[in-house]
Amino acid sequence: MTPVAAAIVATGQTDHVSRRLDASMAEIAREAIDRCLASRNLSFDDIDAIVAGNMEMFEGIYLVDQFFVDALGALGKPLFKLNTGGTVGASVAVCCYHLIASGRYQKVLGVGFEKQSDGSTQAAITTVGDPIWERAVMAGAIGNFATMASTYIHESGVTEEQAAKVAVKARHNACRNPHAHLKLPNLTVEEVLASEYLAFPIHRLDMCPSSDGACAIVMVAGDSADGLAEHPAWVHAAVTAHDQQYMGDSPKRLAVMRSLRAAAEKGYRQAGIADPLRDFDVAEIYEPASYAELAMCENLGICEMGAGGRLIDEGLTQMDGPLPVNPSGGVQSTNPVGATALIRVAEAALQVMGEAGEHQVPEVRRALATGYGGNAWTDLMILSRERPTP
Amino acid sequence: MTSSPAWIVGIGHAACAPARDDVNTTELAWEAISAALDDAGFQLGEIEGAVTASQDFWEGRTISSMSVNEVAGGTLRSEAKVAADGVMALLYAMARIEDGDQHLNLVVAHAKESQADPHTVELAAFDPYYERALNPDETVAAGLQADLYYRRSGLTPEHSARVVAAARRRSGVLDPLSPDEILASPITARPLRALDRAPLMDAATCLVVCDEQIARERDLPRVRLVTGAARSGPWWTARDLTVAPELRAAADEALERAGWTPDSLTRIELGAPYAHQQLLLAEALGLGEGEALVERFEADAGDPRINADGGWLGGTAGTVAGLASAAHAAHELRERGGRALVHGATGLCAQSHAVVLLEGR
């Protein structure tokens, strides 16, 4: 059988900040949706189904999708609520794809939202570990990434300076993105290294912020895309791969991202990617910590294994390099968790549509977006200006 | 495009009990998964991925599918978690098969309600600004709904007790009870009594679903996942709690997509945890009113039979209920043929509705 071709034609984001005192979480979600729909003169009447992502323990609202049913525009419509951790926004996009590719729906709205200032994200993230074996020793995201980054340093020889360069690139790129949270135009490598250790080797400025924000996309079927966007972002791959549940079961985690490699292998095959450095024009990679971007680039085949440090030293992933990575500023600049991975997909779509404004990379034809969550889980999407051939 | 039909080829349940303190969540899910794999004749290594259904709040764990994705075949493969009734997970799994991306998947729903404090969890589902200060829970909301529904319909707690008794009689999990015994249980939120609500349980259900090619090549006994539909309803304080037009709309859409008439259905599964909600939902589907409606729940013959294995009131867990009903229906359709409409609800007072249509050869 042949899947129905699917394309992202509209995106919308809030202007992400640490604390939105002016809006509830429902209002934040709706703001992103309204911006998304308004960008193409769409209304809720045009939408057949809604897919929503949020990590509800972060804000402490059980069945948050049911509470927000009107804010999400879902009254009288199918509402799929996904909940997969950091990946959830990308899981939303993957679900939108399947709902369209299967022929079930023509126009699907995907939305991810989080108002972290309403709750305690790290307390909730601590519950992700097995209650008997893991919770006492791996609390929250920072300790997790510190362990992984240490492994990665050991395996690849990457230095703290090289990681700091990634942190600087992200915050400089963010200055050109009107929606980004952490914009630090004058940040230097020295300042990153001088910021306190949260947990070795992670400096405070190596780590993503905690944001309030939301992101929405509209994905549509086949021919209806052409009338809605001059250059629709066609989906060429929408892949998910997980690793095992216990941290100790993932050998050399982060240095070796088995789920990312598995997802990339399938996605590249589907989209005909032979050399990712050459074949992609831009990548939006889910890098909660600076080290993660380098390790993920290695595992995505953008460089050789162990060569992540050289990638940043040689400027290959800078805005003027052959493969700009995270022109939006990435997760290190913006992290409303339920939306974060959908922002990767939306930013990749903006680049393909040629509508990224000041952070537009010239002549983008193919873009990569990834989501990361749970215990080294991956969602991966490949978007292109070319409509997939059946 | 030509969509590939999806089929149910394996069915498995974990032993359902008020407290499965002999197993953890992973083991509970594996009990259902291994039973379904055995039923279908597959090994876990052959499975391409899974759609799971669970709720973080009941599981006390953010990303609650962390506990099960490994035993659901998710290692280096695709697992997605739906935080809704299992019928929504089944609808998502159908789309993954129909577009040709996945060929052989598991659909797994699991809940260990014994490990949570129900009031704390349910309170978290209420509006934090205006409702939580009143300290409500699901039964408080359902009590208000029952009061309104009884006033509107003329039905009484005695009628609901007969619905519970019918479910208990068919249940493979719970002991039978007479309507009088149900009416003698303590008041929880007037007019509701304790036994008007399905008891909290530890439960897991798994279905093996595959595409046409695998079903044919293996010549597997199978039930077709014909189509489905879903409709979200308004927040519980923003709607008439005595009706469920969203269920009717979802059922009508699914039947129209399938080209079926309502009278061609041989079995209907209604997913709601309170007896008065069962009556309300059946009424919304046009299955009758008043005494005649109650008799439909008690009838063991005549099409369509309602909750022929007892449904949610017969013993399962929230989030699992819709998938457990689909499994029971599929089991019958595989043996005897027929057409089933399986419903699952998510939200306070059965807010949102999903239906899936199954057909046995």
Identify the meaning behind each predicted range.
Chain A
Residues 20-22, 63, 94, 119-125, ...:
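Short acidic, glycine/serine/threonine-rich loops at helix termini
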Residues 58-67, 247-252, 286-310, 321, ...:
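Short glycine/threonine-rich loop-to-helix capping motif typified by GTGT followed
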